[in-house]
Amino acid sequence: MTLRLYDSLTRAKQPLQPLHPGLVTMYCCGITVYDYCHLGHARTCITWDLVRRYLQWSGYEVRYVQNFTDIDDKILKRAVDESSTMEAVSEKFIAAYFEDMEALGVQPADLYPRATHTLDGIKRLIAELEAKGYAYPSGGDVYYSVRNFDGYGKLSGRRLEDLQAGASGRVTVADPDGAQKQDPFDFALWKSAKPGEPAWESPWGKGRPGWHIECSAMVREFLGETIDLHVGGNDLIFPHHENEIAQSEAVTGQPLAQYWLHNGMVKVDGEKMSKSLGNFTTIRALLKTVDPMAIRLLVLQGHYRKPLDFTETAIAAATNGWHTLREGLQFGYDYGGDFGWELAFTPLGPDANQWTVAFQEAVDDDFNFAGGLAVMFELAKHLRSEGNKLKFEGSTPADLDLLQTQWITLVSLAEILGLSINPESQSSNDNGLTDGDIEQLVAQRTQARKDKNWAEGDRLRDVLQEAGITLVDKPGGLTEWFR
Protein backbone atom coordinates (compact mmCIF):
# COMPACT_ATOMS: atom_id res chain seq x y z
CA MET A 1 0.00 0.00 0.00
CA THR A 2 1.23 3.48 -0.84
CA LEU A 3 1.45 6.04 1.93
CA ARG A 4 -1.32 8.59 1.49
CA LEU A 5 -1.44 11.79 3.47
CA TYR A 6 -4.00 14.54 3.82
CA ASP A 7 -2.83 17.72 2.12
CA SER A 8 -4.39 20.86 3.60
CA LEU A 9 -3.92 22.71 0.31
CA THR A 10 -5.84 20.29 -1.93
CA ARG A 11 -8.09 19.19 0.97
CA ALA A 12 -7.66 15.56 -0.07
CA LYS A 13 -5.49 12.55 0.61
CA GLN A 14 -2.57 12.36 -1.79
CA PRO A 15 0.04 9.64 -2.39
CA LEU A 16 3.46 10.62 -1.10
CA GLN A 17 5.75 11.23 -4.07
CA PRO A 18 8.90 13.03 -2.88
CA LEU A 19 10.70 15.39 -5.23
CA HIS A 20 13.79 13.22 -4.93
CA PRO A 21 13.10 9.46 -4.70
CA GLY A 22 14.05 8.10 -1.31
CA LEU A 23 14.45 11.53 0.30
CA VAL A 24 11.78 13.52 2.15
CA THR A 25 12.48 17.14 3.05
CA MET A 26 10.41 18.32 5.99
CA TYR A 27 10.05 21.68 7.73
CA CYS A 28 8.18 22.34 10.95
CA CYS A 29 7.34 25.78 12.29
CA GLY A 30 8.89 25.69 15.74
CA ILE A 31 8.31 27.61 18.93
CA THR A 32 8.75 31.25 19.83
CA VAL A 33 11.18 30.96 22.72
CA TYR A 34 9.68 33.18 25.41
CA ASP A 35 8.25 30.60 27.84
CA TYR A 36 8.26 26.94 28.79
CA CYS A 37 6.61 24.52 26.37
CA HIS A 38 3.01 23.50 27.06
CA LEU A 39 0.75 20.60 26.10
CA GLY A 40 0.07 22.06 22.66
CA HIS A 41 3.79 22.04 21.91
CA ALA A 42 4.00 18.45 23.17
CA ARG A 43 1.24 17.36 20.80
CA THR A 44 2.84 19.11 17.82
CA CYS A 45 6.39 17.93 18.46
CA ILE A 46 5.42 14.33 19.22
CA THR A 47 3.18 14.20 16.13
CA TRP A 48 5.90 15.21 13.70
CA ASP A 49 8.46 13.09 15.51
CA LEU A 50 6.16 10.12 14.88
CA VAL A 51 5.76 11.04 11.21
CA ARG A 52 9.50 11.38 10.77
CA ARG A 53 10.20 8.05 12.50
CA TYR A 54 7.59 6.27 10.41
CA LEU A 55 8.96 7.68 7.16
CA GLN A 56 12.43 6.48 8.13
CA TRP A 57 11.10 3.00 8.94
CA SER A 58 9.36 3.02 5.55
CA GLY A 59 12.74 3.44 3.88
CA TYR A 60 13.00 7.19 3.38
CA GLU A 61 15.87 9.42 4.34
CA VAL A 62 14.28 12.39 6.10
CA ARG A 63 15.92 15.80 6.19
CA TYR A 64 14.09 17.54 9.01
CA VAL A 65 14.43 21.21 9.91
CA GLN A 66 12.60 22.95 12.76
CA ASN A 67 13.15 26.61 13.49
CA PHE A 68 13.31 28.72 16.61
CA THR A 69 11.76 32.19 16.48
CA ASP A 70 14.14 34.17 18.66
CA ILE A 71 13.05 37.68 17.61
CA ASP A 72 9.56 38.54 18.80
CA ASP A 73 7.60 41.08 20.84
CA LYS A 74 6.82 38.44 23.48
CA ILE A 75 10.51 37.67 23.95
CA LEU A 76 11.29 41.36 24.27
CA LYS A 77 8.52 41.81 26.83
CA ARG A 78 9.82 38.87 28.87
CA ALA A 79 13.32 40.34 28.74
CA VAL A 80 12.05 43.68 30.05
CA ASP A 81 9.99 42.00 32.78
CA GLU A 82 13.01 40.00 33.94
CA SER A 83 15.55 42.82 33.47
CA SER A 84 17.28 40.55 31.00
CA THR A 85 18.08 40.54 27.29
CA MET A 86 16.39 38.99 24.27
CA GLU A 87 19.39 36.71 23.79
CA ALA A 88 19.37 35.49 27.40
CA VAL A 89 15.63 34.79 27.36
CA SER A 90 15.94 32.91 24.06
CA GLU A 91 18.84 30.78 25.27
CA LYS A 92 17.03 29.93 28.51
CA PHE A 93 13.93 28.64 26.79
CA ILE A 94 15.75 26.92 23.93
CA ALA A 95 17.64 24.91 26.54
CA ALA A 96 14.36 24.18 28.34
CA TYR A 97 12.81 23.06 25.05
CA PHE A 98 15.51 20.46 24.51
CA GLU A 99 15.12 19.19 28.06
CA ASP A 100 11.37 18.76 27.56
CA MET A 101 11.72 17.05 24.18
CA GLU A 102 14.38 14.70 25.48
CA ALA A 103 12.05 13.65 28.30
CA LEU A 104 9.27 12.98 25.76
CA GLY A 105 11.53 10.90 23.53
CA VAL A 106 11.41 13.37 20.64
CA GLN A 107 14.42 12.92 18.40
CA PRO A 108 16.38 16.09 17.57
CA ALA A 109 15.79 17.68 14.18
CA ASP A 110 18.69 17.71 11.74
CA LEU A 111 18.92 21.47 12.08
CA TYR A 112 17.42 24.17 14.30
CA PRO A 113 17.89 27.48 12.47
CA ARG A 114 17.12 30.68 14.32
CA ALA A 115 15.79 33.94 12.99
CA THR A 116 18.83 35.82 14.32
CA HIS A 117 21.11 33.43 12.43
CA THR A 118 19.23 33.79 9.13
CA LEU A 119 19.12 37.57 8.80
CA ASP A 120 21.10 37.69 5.54
CA GLY A 121 18.69 35.25 3.91
CA ILE A 122 15.70 37.17 5.29
CA LYS A 123 16.95 40.49 3.93
CA ARG A 124 17.78 38.89 0.59
CA LEU A 125 14.24 37.52 0.27
CA ILE A 126 12.66 40.86 1.18
CA ALA A 127 14.82 42.61 -1.43
CA GLU A 128 13.68 40.15 -4.11
CA LEU A 129 10.04 40.68 -3.16
CA GLU A 130 10.51 44.43 -3.42
CA ALA A 131 12.22 44.11 -6.81
CA LYS A 132 9.34 42.00 -8.13
CA GLY A 133 6.70 44.46 -6.91
CA TYR A 134 5.36 42.41 -4.01
CA ALA A 135 6.81 44.55 -1.23
CA TYR A 136 7.11 48.25 -0.52
CA PRO A 137 8.89 50.37 2.09
CA SER A 138 6.88 52.75 4.25
CA GLY A 139 8.01 54.77 7.24
CA GLY A 140 11.08 52.62 7.83
CA ASP A 141 9.04 49.40 7.61
CA VAL A 142 8.63 47.08 4.64
CA TYR A 143 5.23 45.54 3.87
CA TYR A 144 4.03 42.71 1.66
CA SER A 145 1.36 43.77 -0.84
CA VAL A 146 -1.19 40.99 -0.43
CA ARG A 147 -3.40 41.98 -3.37
CA ASN A 148 -0.47 41.62 -5.76
CA PHE A 149 -0.33 37.86 -5.15
CA ASP A 150 -3.14 36.18 -7.05
CA GLY A 151 -3.06 32.97 -5.04
CA TYR A 152 -3.52 34.54 -1.63
CA GLY A 153 -5.98 32.53 0.44
CA LYS A 154 -5.61 29.22 -1.38
CA LEU A 155 -4.38 27.32 1.69
CA SER A 156 -6.92 28.64 4.19
CA GLY A 157 -9.77 28.94 1.71
CA ARG A 158 -10.25 32.60 2.61
CA ARG A 159 -10.90 35.37 0.13
CA LEU A 160 -9.82 38.92 0.75
CA GLU A 161 -13.28 40.21 -0.05
CA ASP A 162 -14.68 38.02 2.72
CA LEU A 163 -12.25 39.26 5.33
CA GLN A 164 -12.88 42.40 7.33
CA ALA A 165 -10.38 44.91 8.60
CA GLY A 166 -12.28 47.18 10.92
CA ALA A 167 -15.45 48.79 9.64
CA SER A 168 -15.95 49.00 5.87
CA GLY A 169 -12.31 48.08 5.25
CA ARG A 170 -10.94 50.86 7.44
CA VAL A 171 -7.93 50.09 9.59
CA THR A 172 -8.78 49.57 13.24
CA VAL A 173 -7.16 51.39 16.12
CA ALA A 174 -5.74 48.01 17.20
CA ASP A 175 -3.45 48.06 14.16
CA PRO A 176 -0.63 50.48 15.04
CA ASP A 177 0.97 50.10 11.62
CA GLY A 178 -2.22 50.73 9.70
CA ALA A 179 -1.42 54.28 8.68
CA GLN A 180 1.75 53.12 6.91
CA LYS A 181 0.09 50.35 4.91
CA GLN A 182 -1.23 50.72 1.40
CA ASP A 183 -3.88 48.13 2.22
CA PRO A 184 -5.25 46.90 5.57
CA PHE A 185 -4.38 43.30 4.67
CA ASP A 186 -0.70 43.97 4.02
CA PHE A 187 1.71 42.59 6.61
CA ALA A 188 5.17 43.56 7.80
CA LEU A 189 8.29 41.97 6.37
CA TRP A 190 10.67 44.35 8.16
CA LYS A 191 9.96 46.51 11.20
CA SER A 192 11.89 49.70 11.85
CA ALA A 193 13.96 49.96 15.00
CA LYS A 194 12.30 51.10 18.21
CA PRO A 195 14.14 52.63 21.17
CA GLY A 196 15.61 50.01 23.46
CA GLU A 197 14.95 47.08 21.12
CA PRO A 198 17.54 44.98 19.27
CA ALA A 199 17.94 46.03 15.65
CA TRP A 200 20.02 45.11 12.64
CA GLU A 201 21.22 47.08 9.63
CA SER A 202 19.31 46.64 6.39
CA PRO A 203 18.77 48.44 3.06
CA TRP A 204 15.63 49.95 4.65
CA GLY A 205 17.30 51.13 7.82
CA LYS A 206 17.89 49.50 11.17
CA GLY A 207 15.16 47.14 12.32
CA ARG A 208 14.15 43.51 12.69
CA PRO A 209 12.23 41.01 10.55
CA GLY A 210 8.55 40.24 10.76
CA TRP A 211 7.50 36.77 11.86
CA HIS A 212 6.20 35.37 8.58
CA ILE A 213 9.28 36.13 6.49
CA GLU A 214 11.52 34.22 8.89
CA CYS A 215 10.13 30.80 7.99
CA SER A 216 10.09 31.48 4.25
CA ALA A 217 13.75 32.43 4.41
CA MET A 218 14.74 29.46 6.56
CA VAL A 219 12.99 26.95 4.29
CA ARG A 220 14.78 28.41 1.30
CA GLU A 221 18.18 28.69 2.98
CA PHE A 222 18.28 25.21 4.50
CA LEU A 223 16.01 22.99 2.37
CA GLY A 224 15.47 24.70 -0.97
CA GLU A 225 12.76 26.51 -2.90
CA THR A 226 10.30 23.60 -2.85
CA ILE A 227 10.14 21.03 -0.06
CA ASP A 228 8.12 17.87 0.37
CA LEU A 229 6.36 18.36 3.71
CA HIS A 230 5.57 21.63 5.47
CA VAL A 231 4.04 20.80 8.84
CA GLY A 232 2.74 22.52 11.96
CA GLY A 233 -0.33 23.18 14.07
CA ASN A 234 -3.57 24.06 12.29
CA ASP A 235 -3.64 27.37 14.15
CA LEU A 236 -0.82 28.42 11.80
CA ILE A 237 -2.76 27.90 8.57
CA PHE A 238 -3.92 31.51 8.62
CA PRO A 239 -2.22 33.85 8.51
CA HIS A 240 1.26 32.36 9.02
CA HIS A 241 1.37 29.57 6.46
CA GLU A 242 -0.79 31.54 4.04
CA ASN A 243 1.73 34.37 4.24
CA GLU A 244 4.65 31.99 3.83
CA ILE A 245 3.16 30.77 0.56
CA ALA A 246 2.62 34.33 -0.64
CA GLN A 247 6.19 35.36 0.16
CA SER A 248 8.00 32.30 -1.18
CA GLU A 249 5.97 31.61 -4.29
CA ALA A 250 5.96 35.26 -5.35
CA VAL A 251 9.75 35.06 -5.63
CA THR A 252 10.30 31.55 -6.96
CA GLY A 253 7.17 30.93 -9.01
CA GLN A 254 7.26 27.40 -7.59
CA PRO A 255 5.18 25.70 -4.87
CA LEU A 256 6.69 26.22 -1.44
CA ALA A 257 5.70 22.69 -0.42
CA GLN A 258 4.30 19.64 -2.15
CA TYR A 259 2.17 18.78 0.87
CA TRP A 260 0.88 20.82 3.80
CA LEU A 261 0.16 18.81 6.95
CA HIS A 262 -1.45 20.23 10.09
CA ASN A 263 -2.11 18.74 13.50
CA GLY A 264 -5.15 19.58 15.60
CA MET A 265 -5.09 21.66 18.74
CA VAL A 266 -5.16 20.55 22.38
CA LYS A 267 -8.19 21.19 24.54
CA VAL A 268 -8.42 20.73 28.30
CA ASP A 269 -11.72 19.26 29.46
CA GLY A 270 -13.31 20.42 26.23
CA GLU A 271 -12.09 24.02 26.45
CA LYS A 272 -9.32 25.78 24.62
CA MET A 273 -6.13 25.74 26.65
CA SER A 274 -5.20 29.22 27.85
CA LYS A 275 -3.61 30.92 30.82
CA SER A 276 -6.70 33.08 31.33
CA LEU A 277 -8.85 29.97 31.89
CA GLY A 278 -6.37 28.55 34.36
CA ASN A 279 -6.02 25.30 32.41
CA PHE A 280 -2.57 25.99 31.01
CA THR A 281 -0.08 23.19 31.80
CA THR A 282 3.60 23.09 30.92
CA ILE A 283 5.29 19.89 29.82
CA ARG A 284 7.68 19.92 32.76
CA ALA A 285 4.84 20.31 35.24
CA LEU A 286 2.96 17.40 33.65
CA LEU A 287 6.03 15.16 33.69
CA LYS A 288 6.16 15.38 37.48
CA THR A 289 3.08 13.16 37.68
CA VAL A 290 2.69 11.45 34.28
CA ASP A 291 4.98 8.94 32.57
CA PRO A 292 6.35 10.50 29.35
CA MET A 293 5.46 7.32 27.46
CA ALA A 294 1.84 7.75 28.53
CA ILE A 295 1.92 11.25 27.04
CA ARG A 296 3.24 9.85 23.75
CA LEU A 297 0.54 7.20 23.84
CA LEU A 298 -2.14 9.82 24.46
CA VAL A 299 -1.02 11.63 21.29
CA LEU A 300 -0.89 8.36 19.35
CA GLN A 301 -4.40 7.28 20.29
CA GLY A 302 -6.11 10.16 18.50
CA HIS A 303 -5.78 11.05 14.82
CA TYR A 304 -3.23 13.80 14.38
CA ARG A 305 -5.63 16.09 12.48
CA LYS A 306 -8.33 15.95 15.14
CA PRO A 307 -8.47 18.01 18.36
CA LEU A 308 -6.93 16.27 21.37
CA ASP A 309 -8.94 16.66 24.57
CA PHE A 310 -6.69 16.40 27.60
CA THR A 311 -8.70 15.13 30.55
CA GLU A 312 -7.93 13.12 33.66
CA THR A 313 -9.87 10.25 32.13
CA ALA A 314 -7.85 10.42 28.90
CA ILE A 315 -4.49 10.48 30.64
CA ALA A 316 -5.57 7.64 32.96
CA ALA A 317 -6.58 5.57 29.91
CA ALA A 318 -3.26 6.34 28.22
CA THR A 319 -1.39 5.37 31.39
CA ASN A 320 -3.27 2.07 31.58
CA GLY A 321 -2.61 1.47 27.90
CA TRP A 322 1.09 2.09 28.42
CA HIS A 323 1.12 -0.43 31.29
CA THR A 324 -0.31 -3.04 28.91
CA LEU A 325 2.26 -2.31 26.21
CA ARG A 326 5.07 -2.21 28.75
CA GLU A 327 4.17 -5.68 30.07
CA GLY A 328 4.24 -7.03 26.53
CA LEU A 329 7.56 -5.33 25.80
CA GLN A 330 9.03 -6.72 29.01
CA PHE A 331 8.13 -10.32 28.13
CA GLY A 332 11.33 -11.18 26.27
CA TYR A 333 13.57 -9.60 28.88
CA ASP A 334 11.80 -11.52 31.64
CA TYR A 335 11.59 -14.94 30.00
CA GLY A 336 13.65 -14.91 26.80
CA GLY A 337 16.86 -15.88 28.57
CA ASP A 338 15.23 -19.07 29.83
CA PHE A 339 14.17 -19.90 26.27
CA GLY A 340 17.63 -19.23 24.80
CA TRP A 341 16.47 -16.17 22.87
CA GLU A 342 18.96 -13.65 21.53
CA LEU A 343 17.81 -10.39 23.11
CA ALA A 344 19.89 -8.16 20.83
CA PHE A 345 18.36 -8.11 17.36
CA THR A 346 17.88 -5.96 14.28
CA PRO A 347 14.43 -4.28 14.33
CA LEU A 348 12.02 -5.67 11.78
CA GLY A 349 11.11 -3.89 8.56
CA PRO A 350 7.65 -3.32 7.03
CA ASP A 351 7.33 -6.66 5.22
CA ALA A 352 8.67 -8.91 7.99
CA ASN A 353 5.44 -10.65 8.97
CA GLN A 354 1.65 -10.36 9.17
CA TRP A 355 1.78 -7.90 12.07
CA THR A 356 4.25 -5.46 10.50
CA VAL A 357 2.20 -5.57 7.29
CA ALA A 358 -1.02 -4.84 9.20
CA PHE A 359 0.72 -2.03 11.09
CA GLN A 360 1.92 -0.45 7.85
CA GLU A 361 -1.46 -0.80 6.16
CA ALA A 362 -3.04 1.15 9.01
CA VAL A 363 -0.45 3.90 9.28
CA ASP A 364 -0.12 4.34 5.52
CA ASP A 365 -3.65 5.75 5.61
CA ASP A 366 -2.76 9.34 6.54
CA PHE A 367 -0.63 8.35 9.54
CA ASN A 368 -3.38 6.43 11.31
CA PHE A 369 -1.21 5.57 14.28
CA ALA A 370 -4.25 4.53 16.31
CA GLY A 371 -4.81 1.73 13.80
CA GLY A 372 -1.18 0.71 14.13
CA LEU A 373 -1.53 0.69 17.91
CA ALA A 374 -4.38 -1.81 17.63
CA VAL A 375 -1.91 -4.29 16.13
CA MET A 376 0.52 -3.62 18.96
CA PHE A 377 -2.09 -4.02 21.69
CA GLU A 378 -3.11 -7.37 20.21
CA LEU A 379 0.49 -8.56 20.51
CA ALA A 380 1.03 -7.02 23.94
CA LYS A 381 -2.09 -8.58 25.46
CA HIS A 382 -1.15 -11.99 24.10
CA LEU A 383 2.40 -11.73 25.47
CA ARG A 384 1.09 -10.52 28.81
CA SER A 385 -1.24 -13.51 28.97
CA GLU A 386 1.61 -15.90 28.21
CA GLY A 387 3.73 -14.15 30.82
CA ASN A 388 1.03 -14.72 33.43
CA LYS A 389 0.99 -18.43 32.57
CA LEU A 390 4.74 -18.62 33.03
CA LYS A 391 4.58 -16.65 36.24
CA PHE A 392 1.77 -18.55 37.92
CA GLU A 393 1.87 -21.96 36.21
CA GLY A 394 5.56 -22.24 35.37
CA SER A 395 5.06 -23.13 31.70
CA THR A 396 3.14 -22.35 28.52
CA PRO A 397 1.98 -24.62 25.68
CA ALA A 398 2.61 -21.80 23.16
CA ASP A 399 5.06 -22.16 20.27
CA LEU A 400 8.23 -20.50 21.61
CA ASP A 401 9.49 -19.53 18.14
CA LEU A 402 6.19 -17.81 17.44
CA LEU A 403 6.32 -16.07 20.82
CA GLN A 404 9.80 -14.80 20.01
CA THR A 405 8.62 -13.46 16.65
CA GLN A 406 5.68 -11.74 18.31
CA TRP A 407 7.88 -10.17 20.97
CA ILE A 408 10.50 -8.96 18.48
CA THR A 409 7.68 -7.54 16.36
CA LEU A 410 6.19 -5.63 19.29
CA VAL A 411 9.57 -4.22 20.31
CA SER A 412 10.27 -3.20 16.69
CA LEU A 413 6.93 -1.44 16.28
CA ALA A 414 7.29 0.29 19.64
CA GLU A 415 10.68 1.59 18.57
CA ILE A 416 9.13 3.16 15.48
CA LEU A 417 6.74 5.08 17.74
CA GLY A 418 9.42 6.08 20.25
CA LEU A 419 7.87 3.93 22.98
CA SER A 420 10.49 2.43 25.26
CA ILE A 421 10.35 0.56 28.55
CA ASN A 422 13.68 2.19 29.28
CA PRO A 423 13.03 5.67 27.88
CA GLU A 424 16.64 6.74 27.79
CA SER A 425 17.62 10.01 26.21
CA GLN A 426 17.32 10.04 22.45
CA SER A 427 19.77 12.93 22.42
CA SER A 428 22.42 12.40 25.09
CA ASN A 429 25.79 10.68 24.98
CA ASP A 430 28.00 8.86 27.44
CA ASN A 431 29.22 12.18 28.79
CA GLY A 432 25.68 13.06 29.89
CA LEU A 433 25.39 16.20 27.73
CA THR A 434 21.85 16.79 26.51
CA ASP A 435 21.02 18.93 23.49
CA GLY A 436 20.07 21.70 25.90
CA ASP A 437 23.47 21.50 27.61
CA ILE A 438 25.23 21.65 24.25
CA GLU A 439 23.15 24.62 23.08
CA GLN A 440 24.06 26.51 26.24
CA LEU A 441 27.78 25.79 25.85
CA VAL A 442 27.70 26.77 22.17
CA ALA A 443 25.88 30.01 23.06
CA GLN A 444 28.45 30.79 25.77
CA ARG A 445 31.26 30.20 23.28
CA THR A 446 29.56 32.42 20.70
CA GLN A 447 29.28 35.22 23.26
CA ALA A 448 32.90 34.78 24.31
CA ARG A 449 34.00 35.11 20.68
CA LYS A 450 31.87 38.24 20.28
CA ASP A 451 33.56 39.66 23.36
CA LYS A 452 36.96 38.69 21.87
CA ASN A 453 37.55 36.46 24.90
CA TRP A 454 39.42 33.95 22.79
CA ALA A 455 40.77 31.94 25.72
CA GLU A 456 37.26 31.27 27.05
CA GLY A 457 36.03 30.46 23.56
CA ASP A 458 38.83 27.93 23.10
CA ARG A 459 38.13 26.42 26.52
CA LEU A 460 34.47 25.89 25.69
CA ARG A 461 35.38 24.42 22.31
CA ASP A 462 37.69 21.93 24.04
CA VAL A 463 34.94 20.98 26.52
CA LEU A 464 32.59 20.23 23.65
CA GLN A 465 35.19 18.35 21.63
CA GLU A 466 36.04 16.17 24.63
CA ALA A 467 32.33 15.30 24.80
CA GLY A 468 32.43 14.18 21.18
CA ILE A 469 30.79 17.31 19.74
CA THR A 470 32.02 18.69 16.41
CA LEU A 471 31.65 22.45 15.89
CA VAL A 472 31.36 24.08 12.47
CA ASP A 473 31.64 27.88 12.47
CA LYS A 474 29.64 29.50 9.66
CA PRO A 475 29.60 33.08 8.33
CA GLY A 476 27.66 35.58 10.40
CA GLY A 477 28.59 34.09 13.75
CA LEU A 478 26.48 30.94 13.34
CA THR A 479 27.90 27.73 14.81
CA GLU A 480 26.45 24.34 13.97
CA TRP A 481 27.23 21.26 16.05
CA PHE A 482 27.14 17.55 15.39
CA ARG A 483 27.63 14.46 17.51
Swiss-Prot record:
Protein name as it appears in the record: Cysteine--tRNA ligase
GO-annotated cellular components: cytoplasm
Short motif 'HIGH' region, span: 31-41
Assembly: Monomer.
Species of origin: Synechocystis sp. (strain ATCC 27184 / PCC 6803 / Kazusa)
Enzymatic class: ligase
Pfam families for this protein: CysS_C (PF23493), DALR_2 (PF09190), tRNA-synt_1e (PF01406)
Subcellular location: Cytoplasm
Gene designation per UniProt: cysS
Keywords: Aminoacyl-tRNA synthetase, ATP-binding, Cytoplasm, Ligase, Metal-binding, Nucleotide-binding, Protein biosynthesis, Zinc
PANTHER family associated with the record: CYSTEINE--TRNA LIGASE, CYTOPLASMIC, CYSTEINYL-TRNA SYNTHETASE
